[in-house]
Amino acid sequence: ETTIAVLKNPKHDILSTLKGPDFPGGGFLFYNETELQKIYDTGRGSVTVRAKWNYNKQDNCLEVTEIPYSTTIEAIKDKIVDCIKQGKLREVSYVRDETDIDGLKIAIDLKRGSDPEKVMQKLFRMTPLQDNYSCNFNILVGGAPRVMGVREILEEWSAFRLECVRRRLVFDLQKKQEKLHLLLG
């Protein structure tokens, strides 16, 4: 959608159609328009990604269902266990990986009387459940690396695709001309 809009109007506001990165592991992206605009313009910057979670009142546990792209379940579990051992997380009694066919899930059991919101804020501060993801759009153009913004990347990609289509058409035309030459004798 953004590529088509930029092709139609080179001055198109990219932020209006390209809202932000979409990570395979999911997570919640803190939307900072100025930082995102800087990344889109220069190809450098960072965004803050936070895990998605909910509170299971029946089991008195926090369920993390999406994690930042730059971390793993094991790293999160290890850091939580370290914090529990150091006495920094007295509200947490146990952490386990309940990932199955339904998807990712880290269950964090809370002690009675713990406030889930406050515990999650602590977890975001002390573990990889919240992380900064650095962007560096380093692209090879003509065999040389360049850092480019999104608009430049889209323009380079469009030019590359146009050249690919042109070369394919020239190749097909040559094959058809050779076949025509053989048929005509």
Predicted features along the sequence, with ranges:
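C-terminal interaction appendages of subunits in large macromolecular complexes
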Residues: 1-185
